[in-house]
Swiss-Prot record:
Known catalytic reactions: L-seryl-[protein] + ATP = O-phospho-L-seryl-[protein] + ADP + H(+); L-threonyl-[protein] + ATP = O-phospho-L-threonyl-[protein] + ADP + H(+)
EC number of the protein: 2.7.11.1
Organism: Saccharomyces cerevisiae (strain ATCC 204508 / S288c)
Name used for this protein in its record: Serine/threonine-protein kinase TOS3
Keyword ATP-binding in annotation: yes
Domain Protein kinase span(s) in chain numbering: 50-344
Amino acid sequence: MVLLKEPVQPLPRSSLLYNNASNSSSRIKETRKVKLLYNPLTKRQILNNFEILATLGNGQYGKVKLARDLGTGALVAIKILNRFEKRSGYSLQLKVENPRVNQEIEVMKRCHHENVVELYEILNDPESTKVYLVLEYCSRGPVKWCPENKMEIKAVGPSILTFQQSRKVVLDVVSGLEYLHSQGITHRDIKPSNLLISSNGTVKISDFGVAMSTATGSTNIQSSHEQLLKSRALGTPAFFAPELCSTEKEYSCSSAIDIWSLGVTIYCLLFGKLPFNANSGLELFDSIINKPLEFPSYEEMLNGATSGITMEEYTDAKDLLKKLLQKDPDKRIKLADIKVHPFMCHYGKSDAASVLTNLETFHELKVSPPSSCKRVELVSLPVNSSFASLDSVYMENFDHNNLRTGADRNSTYSPSIYDANTLSPSAYHNIGSRESSYSSFSSFTSSTAFASQISIQDAPAIGDQQCLIGESGSSLRVNSCEFPQYTTMSPVGEYPFESTEASLSSTLTPVGNVPQRIKAHLVEGKSNSKDDLRIEADASLVFEASDAQRTRRRMSLYKL
């Protein structure tokens, strides 16, 4: 059980609550060079000085990884942001900077408060397509208010939290919001999943991907007008304020937006369901704008985790929510008034001297200690490879036996029962039937890159003239089962492969004298694709056998 902190008291103006942006940003390390390595023994990637341990979450604007600082042993969270936007109709050569990346960085640079997740370091290599934010790690994870087996959008209550547990969460969030608003920052996406709990029970506001700033003095922060034009499409619709849902009148980007989403959050924590819900976006917006606020009855509340609440406490909770979820933003309650509201100050019979959280609700992720394995040579990976990137599905499932040099593979191969004309060494065979990806076309002819990243799987006999066709995003993947061919997909045309045959031969070191013939042709992509066109290559190499079936293996390479 984890002890939640006592209610947060208002801080003096000289405290962290009123730290200015310059003091906060000076604490943050900025690194302009990114190096990505792979440890074949631990099967883990290493980003600069951080060993990647696990995936913490996948958001709309980036994936978050758990990592260990190899210098200090401290655990951190690393958020991975795409430097460039994906836009329909653009080729790989035309890249558009993602404005939200700089926006999030500039906002987080201004923040240093105990109830806001802290930014430690920015890994921003101009040559990388990713930007990495090294953040404070909150081991208890996000605040949960409905059972694990229930989708939040379909939750009907009751909440798995008590009123007192919810009150403790809200006090910390109010403290964090008060700080953000004092810095001219509107979070724009306050919701339970963006409220993280540290190991000591402190609740911290996280995820500033859609945050807005009215602060001056930074040229990287978009103007208020630009932010307003984009804000209606960003965030979580179920937590949108009415002024975000209506297009009939203009609105200003104000702290009232966060007050409303805080009200929706408190409603979820107390009653275990969303205050406004619908089957479609338009219905949801209409409900938020026009539907009156409703509450479960006191009798219903007594059947859930809140069975110990008093009628007075229940009445105070409803009164606070009515003031938070006020349709008119000008009439919404202020943060200072929330802290002194009777519900926040009330202590009923459900309270105790110390409030313990439910381990099922706020469990702490267990992380194994650093490995004490012997020294191993790390494999250097290209930083822009879709295969090697930290948010790649290939790398997350990658088999470390796949990372071997040509010499290693040859030394471990013993012909034994295999025919000399059949490619069957165990080091080659069936590495999860996964494709390998590369950062540039030149890597197809690079012996080191190719030797360390290959995927080989059984293919039908040559007599079977069928084709295997599958989709991969915006590309049409063609793995022909005809005689050996090399297929390339490109928005610009065919590539010459005169030198490829020699490079492949020397790199793969096939068993026996096997003729290898490679040809290339262009395959058209899907015309209605909304994603960027992608270059894809599939090489099928035939290794003839002496048996009647003419057994063969297929090797596939992909640049995604």
